[in-house]
Amino acid sequence: MLSSLNVLQSSFRGKTALSNSTLLQKVSFAGKEYSLEPIDERTPILFQWFEARPERYEKGEVPILNTKEHPYLSNIINAAKIENERIIGVLVDGNFTYEQKKEFLNLENEHQNIKIIYRADVDFSMYDKKLSDIYLENIHKQESYPASERDNYLLGLLREELKNIPEGKDSLIESYAEKREHTWFDFFRNLAILKAGSLFTETGKTGCHNISPCSGCIYLDADMIITDKLGVLYAPDGIAVHVDCNDEIKSLENGAIVVNRSNHPALLAGLDIMKSKVDAHPYYDGLGKGIKRHFNYSSLHNYNAFCDFIEFKHENIIPNTSMYTSSSW
């Protein structure tokens, strides 16, 4: 088995990294060293709420779920109060009414560091690809195989799907914009974190003048509860993600993702995978496989050790609180 994780990485976890950062500047995985890159106290925090059923809200309610079981709006407001020197972005999407958009504006007025960012107002076109190109590339790949190795059933499906692309909808991004399930969340989460600092600067939100378009961001699911300021974070090569552990089996999760710069190459690697497969998944391929590719992870490595290497964990964040309740969908 190849060498996996340098033992020095164990000090990279939230505030622990602060006290040891002068001693431990490097971590290693798969025989390669990576700098623990800082993510400073003014890096914006990003939440996301994509609402599939905006009609479920009463008049005068901000259309972000805020029940006893799922107090997501309260968690966001709590984060804005604690991290009052950071900009707190909320990327939203859904068929909101005029009155609901007014409630978003009222939320911004009441909490000056909260910025509502509408998905439709963000230019993600630099990350797009024609669906027809994705299908054609996969068709040509199948056609290049010897007849005995060709999957004719798959080839027929690909040709049929190519013919059925709706007029004016030949776009990977548009195909996800019309979904109303978890891949809708996951795909645009990846794109938003790719834009990172520029997500805040390009949408013309007031109060974001101190954010560099090239800077990173701290993404948190709305079920993550901040209990105190996060301070400076450190991440290997500038990226770390939440890790779940179930019966000692670990897995990369997208509930928390921190990056120190826009267009992080690990996320770009995941986007390349999304653009190469007709059945790609934004969580498994766009995030998980992209990070693994970037850090040269293979099946020869210890997966739990890789999860330890890339884990974002902080003593001032209570993670994944919705695991104790029923689905908010």
Swiss-Prot record:
Gene Ontology annotations of biological process type: symbiont-mediated suppression of host NF-kappaB cascade; symbiont-mediated suppression of host programmed cell death
Result of altering residue 58 to A: Does not affect ability to disrupt TNF signaling in infected cells
Residues reported in the UniProt entry to bind Mn(2+): 223, 320, 322
Result, substituting residue 185 to A: Does not affect protein-arginine N-acetylglucosaminyltransferase activity
Binding residues for UDP-N-acetyl-alpha-D-glucosamine: 48-50, 72, 219-222, 322, 327-329
Stated consequence of mutating residue 221 to A: Abolished protein-arginine N-acetylglucosaminyltransferase activity
Reaction(s) catalysed by this chain's protein: L-arginyl-[protein] + UDP-N-acetyl-alpha-D-glucosamine = N(omega)-(N-acetyl-beta-D-glucosaminyl)-L-arginyl-[protein] + UDP + H(+)
Enzyme Commission (EC) number: 2.4.1.-
PTM info: Auto-glycosylated: arginine GlcNAcylation is required for activity toward death domain-containing host target proteins.
Consequence recorded when altering residue 151 to A: Strongly decreased protein-arginine N-acetylglucosaminyltransferase activity
Keywords noted in UniProt: Glycoprotein, Glycosyltransferase, Host cytoplasm, Manganese, Metal-binding, Secreted, Toxin, Transferase, Virulence
Active site: 253
Compartments, as annotated in UniProt: Secreted; Host cytoplasm
Record text about domains: Adopts a GT-A fold and acts as an inverting enzyme that converts the alpha-configuration in the UDP-N-acetyl-alpha-D-glucosamine donor to the beta configuration in the N-linked (GlcNAc) arginine product.
Similarity remark: Belongs to the glycosyltransferase NleB family.
Name of the featured protein: Protein-arginine N-acetylglucosaminyltransferase NleB1
Organism listed in the record: Escherichia coli O127:H6 (strain E2348/69 / EPEC)
